[in-house]
Amino acid sequence: MMLEGKSYLVSRSLPSSCEPETEWAYLAHEVLSGKRPTPEDVEVEDLDEADGGGKRSKPPSPQPHTPDICEGHGSSRHASGCGEQQGTGSNPMNSIGRDLTINCLLRLSRSDYGSVASLSRDFRAMVRSGEIYRLRRQSGVAEHWVYFSCNVLEWDAYDPYRERWIQVPKMPPDECFMCSDKESLAVGTQLLVFAMAHIVFRYSILTNSWTMADPMNSPRCLFGSTSVGEKAFVAGGTDSGGNILSSAEMYDSETHTWTPLPSMNRARKMCSGVFMDGKFYVIGGVANNNRVLTCGEEYDLKRRSWRIIENMSEGLNGVTGAPPLIAVVNNELYAADYSEKDLKKYDKKNNRWITLGKLPERSVSMNGWGLAFRACGDRLIVIGGPRTYTGGTIELNSWIPDERPPVWNLIARRPSGNFVYNCAVMGC
């Protein structure tokens, strides 16, 4: 759905059944590398240039934007407003069959789906309805993009696969979102942002737009959350009266509905959530009388029951500060200890945290606030920047966990506010 510069059919390996289909590859290449409008005044920041070295390892790439899939592309645009190539031979489904075409589409980068939608009405319907993403999910195909906000009402997105920045439309100017105290989560093809007065806005990559979303059954803030596939889970937090909650809910991004879940054993706010080994975990937080909780809770989706894990967050950070900064990669739990600037890994067998090494040097925080720590596919991502009095820079560092101490790679940098208010990773 999101356009960029020159693209090709295969962004990652395809089954051998797709290789002989040169006609489909040619047609897709013609559309994806065709004549499309791109902002000429905005460029992706090159790392060498950002470092001040005065050298470029590659020419600047145009920054993609996130148009509605009905945006036209060059001369193929119809008067109706939706681009579609004309001619009986222009629809690959007629040439190689629907099943094989869809199999190829599933493995195409989702940043190309805006162009794919211009091939035919069938393709456009698959993208606009979200069917293509449901099929990707069923086939185990996903790309993870990072969405984060360093300014009120503004969001940036970054595609680490193609090293591209993507423009996200500005949020509607609702007064409830004018302060920085918001929470967010990504689920399916949606980004949910929660603000004061229990107002929720939903950004959809299918339409590239923001809309008002239904609130939870028990609206809350300062809760723990996570998502897997088209489902999201929230637990704990506080209600509008400041009462600390033990209740939990599940959100279905396909139906846009919230369903109550059994309550946790202990009420908590300022907790964190992850999905690991097929279960929902809520870690840390604060109970009544500002008592810090070191226990975690595990929710079994099949049994619909919670289990307390004592001392699960013992040794993470101090008694004050942000909720635990945790992330799961390949069913292994990691934490950013912002008090010591350490990266830690959870030892499931012994219920303890092991220090692996340090966090990126230039990623600073205010007791954990302003720093983002997320899983992005098979890698960990730290988003933050150095504190400066003039201007600001946001940096994205990544590391793919292995058996060695972490070696962080700077994958992106751009001028921006360097305090991250919200961050979510969308995998679809």
Regions found by a protein language model. Give the residues of each.
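CRL adaptor-proximal regions
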Residues: 1-95, 103
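Eukaryotic beta-rich interaction modules
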Residues: 86, 168, 174-177
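Conserved short beta-strand element of beta-propeller blades
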Residues: 94-95, 116, 134-150, 174-194, ...
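A structural motif specific to WD40 beta-propellers
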Residues: 166-168, 211-213, 259-261, 307-309, ...
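Short active-site-adjacent structural elements
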Residues: 364, 382-383, 389-394, 404-408
